[in-house]
């Protein structure tokens, strides 16, 4: 009996475990060092950098056109949204105006990217808490969207489709019609996923009141995107500082109120419906005959001359050769451009010294700030809740490690 009493007064020993980097719920190469008291999380220490490729430094040694490809490889779930930010920064420094049709094509593909991202996130978040059907249904729809990417750019993921001044090529009318037809059937598929998850008792038990962040926390940690809107702040760059043609489009901004994993899930589900509304408006605009025209600024130094012109004119041939070897010299200056990427505010800070390559390019990845708060959000939760919280943060290591 005496021995039992002495054991009871001993200090409890916490133990440390590694979560990842090969864990399926880590959403990439994330290593979390977890300190546990029994099954309660005391401390979370994210170890990042396992996918670091030195993107920002590599961009300093590439021309502006060559640099676009690196942005596809950041958040590789929705590549064109990142290209958009970089092209807008280059346009701002070079003083290029994008033709209206080019802007509508850009917005259409940015919203396809948003649906691609949210479909992956919502369905894998369900998989993290034990539901296997949603990913199978969601990936079927993602596959169709990947085909739209491929039909526009030739590639399913690393599109390299946006250019400073617009987009590389106009969309075939059949493709626009197919996207429009997809928009009509997709909400029913979304309802199917909705019916499986939203009122599901197990799904709610695993997500409600897990990983709560208040409005004050959101501002203090520098969150953006769904992480902000899930806590009740209607902050969306497409509405608060409109870029491209978002000010001409009608859409709502879904907002949560509790700031937990469940509200963030609901926000993403609703955002997909809003993205479909935007896609329908873009397709309808692009299909009108009076809106035909250029998709790439013809007066821009970034635009290559047409093939027919190159066969006739020596100057056009020289311009083409110079554009793809030396690249374009962009005026000296610096600028910051942010877009509302699916994960939050994706920003590009571009400094030009007047040469054909960026002098410095800083990438502001939204997931980086979200992962930084992992310790704060997980403290006091159970070990099983850690994967639910990571799932609702929506992290991709291409952009976090860069």
Swiss-Prot record:
Membrane topology category: Peripheral membrane protein
Gene Ontology molecular function, alphabetical: NAD binding; NADH:ubiquinone reductase (non-electrogenic) activity; quinone binding
Localization per record: Cell inner membrane
Assembly, per entry: NDH-1 is composed of 14 different subunits. Subunits NuoB, C, D, E, F, and G constitute the peripheral sector of the complex.
PANTHER family: NADH DEHYDROGENASE [UBIQUINONE] IRON-SULFUR PROTEIN 2, MITOCHONDRIAL (PTHR11993:SF10), NADH-UBIQUINONE OXIDOREDUCTASE 49 KDA SUBUNIT (PTHR11993)
Role according to the record: NDH-1 shuttles electrons from NADH, via FMN and iron-sulfur (Fe-S) centers, to quinones in the respiratory chain. The immediate electron acceptor for the enzyme in this species is believed to be ubiquinone. Couples the redox reaction to proton translocation (for every two electrons transferred, four hydrogen ions are translocated across the cytoplasmic membrane), and thus conserves the redox energy in a proton gradient.
Family: Belongs to the complex I 49 kDa subunit family.
Designated name of the protein: NADH-quinone oxidoreductase subunit D
Species per Swiss-Prot/TrEMBL record: Maricaulis maris (strain MCS10) (Caulobacter maris)
